[in-house]
């Protein structure tokens, strides 16, 4: 068996090791020539994983039986493109785009009433001088709210906002006052924070069937952008926990079907 690993950072080492223990020949790709996974794999290729064509060209003749990925964030779309082109099981490019584009994800779920908080797009092309105007445009927004990059993971660049004043301050960080003509290098989204307790979900797609593995409660520390993960707690086996599990599983089953996810593992926070 042959596998291609897209994204070969340090976090991929365990995956490579386990694949090799099963007798799988691993070809790893990463744009960083010093990536740890390139050295650990049976074959390492220095290729920018954001370049779908270059990745496809490299794998076309190698004909991997399946893909394995590290935490590659936005460029999960490259894995989807490879799966589509080579007819491999796993996430499609369209499904990967839904999962990595936070604004598109919101719009897609909103179509089926699976998400009811307001979510607004702040494009990178917006002029810095508009920061104050943008804050006024969002005057009907309900707080708390979250401002975050349209793409990315790991709580990167997140602002947790409790009032309009904090929103204006956050927009000033995105639009530096001393750069009259500069614009943010990326789009942002501003959305109303869902009330209640935050939960993390670990799950996988068994073909087109959603299977939940772990449901864990999460707490937000201050400040939010420094991270908010805490050690997992073993859930109590009582009626409340059982009903919560069933409700989360039912919602995510509908969500994954809408996004077209098949044969994949995922972690989703709600």
Which residues does each predicted region cover?
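ATP-binding N-terminal substructure of ATP-dependent carboxylate-amine bond-forming enzymes
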Residues: 1-95, 128
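Hydrophobic residues in well-ordered beta-strands that form the structural core
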Residues: 28, 90-92, 118, 147, ...
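Short, charged, surface-exposed secondary-structure boundary motifs
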Residues: 37-40, 55-57, 98-104, 157, ...
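Short, hinge-like loop/turn segments at secondary-structure boundaries
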Residues: 43-48, 85-87, 108-110, 164, ...
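Active-site nucleotide/adenylate-binding loops and adjacent lid/helix of ATP-dependent enzymes
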Residues: 101-188, 194-195, 234-250
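Phosphate-binding core of ATP-grasp and ATP-grasp-like enzymes
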Residues: 174-178, 184, 192-237, 245-270
């Amino acid at each position: 068996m042959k596998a291609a690993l897209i994204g070969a950072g340090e976090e991929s080492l365990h995956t490579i090791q386990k694949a090799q223990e099963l007798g799988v020949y691993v070809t790893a790709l990463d744009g960083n020539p010093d990536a740890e996974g390139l050295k650990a794999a049976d074959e390492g290729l220095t290729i920018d994983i954001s370049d779908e064509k270059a990745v496809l060209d490299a794998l076309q003749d190698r004909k991997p039986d399946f893909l394995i990925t590290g935490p590659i964030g936005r460029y999960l779309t490259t894995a989807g493109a490879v799966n589509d082109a080579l007819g491999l099981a796993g996430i499609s490019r369209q499904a990967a785009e839904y999962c990595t584009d936070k604004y598109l994800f919101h719009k897609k779920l909103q179509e089926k009433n699976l998400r009811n908080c307001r979510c607004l797009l702040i494009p990178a092309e917006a002029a810095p001088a508009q920061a104050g105007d943008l804050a006024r445009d969002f005057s009907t927004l309900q707080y708390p709210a979250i401002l975050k990059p349209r793409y990315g993971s790991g709580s990167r660049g997140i602002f947790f906002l409790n009032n309009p004043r904090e929103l204006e301050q956050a927009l000033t960080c995105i639009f530096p006052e001393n750069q009259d003509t500069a614009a943010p290098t990326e789009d942002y989204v501003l959305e109303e924070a869902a009330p209640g307790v935050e939960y993390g979900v670990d799950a996988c797609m068994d073909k087109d069937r959603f299977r939940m593995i772990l449901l864990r409660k999460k707490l937000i520390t201050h400040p939010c952008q420094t991270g908010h993960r805490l050690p997992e707690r073993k859930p109590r086996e009582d009626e409340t926990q059982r009903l919560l599990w069933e409700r989360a599983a039912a919602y995510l089953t509908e969500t994954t079907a809408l996004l077209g996810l098949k044969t994949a593992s995922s972690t989703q926070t709600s």
